[in-house]
């Protein structure tokens, strides 16, 4: 009876360990997929400062989030991920297509130009593609997305965005790293 209990305990430990290893391997696979997806998206020819893409990977399924300026970009991103990232089972999109608007386009261009041409922000202008600060405009309302190097740069980008005529509000989601 004692041998049976010991054997049962060892079996339970082994099964728990194997189950944990399987979950860890799946997690690792998703992490590898996420790194590859990030690479594909960052280098995509259609990814501009006027779009913002986030994603999650769960059991090999990639789900895209964010905003883009044109609907064709979503299909292009999905095709690139499926073509260049092994082990992706499916790509889903929950992305928002920003409304077409001449006024928003004008605001978008001026804000990005002013941010990337400000002497204090030049290090972001010469950064590798894609640029680290993304300017999302919807009905005159700006959302800044991306990453900057300091709290001061975050506030400066917001101040530059607020100074543009036609801007109704600015939401600053820039992360400081």
Q: Where are these predicted regions, by residue range?
A:
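N-terminal targeting leaders
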Residues: 2-8, 16-177
């Amino acid at each position: 009876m004692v041998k049976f209990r010991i054997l049962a305990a060892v079996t339970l430990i082994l099964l728990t360990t194997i189950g944990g290893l399987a979950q860890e391997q799946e997690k690792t696979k998703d992490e590898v997929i996420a790194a590859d997806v990030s690479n594909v998206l960052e280098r995509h020819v259609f990814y501009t400062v006027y779009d913002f893409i986030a994603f999650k990977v769960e059991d090999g399924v990639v789900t895209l989030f964010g905003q883009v300026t044109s609907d064709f970009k979503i299909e292009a991103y999905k095709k690139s991920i499926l073509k260049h990232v092994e082990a992706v089972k499916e790509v889903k999109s929950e992305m928002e297509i920003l409304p077409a608007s001449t006024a928003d386009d004008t605001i978008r261009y001026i804000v990005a130009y002013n941010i990337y041409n400000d002497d204090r922000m030049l290090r972001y202008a010469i950064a590798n593609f894609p640029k680290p600060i993304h300017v999302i405009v919807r009905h005159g309302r700006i959302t800044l997305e991306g990453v900057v190097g300091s709290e001061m740069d975050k506030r400066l980008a917001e101040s530059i965005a607020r100074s543009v005529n036609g801007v109704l509000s600015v939401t600053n989601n820039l992360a400081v790293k």
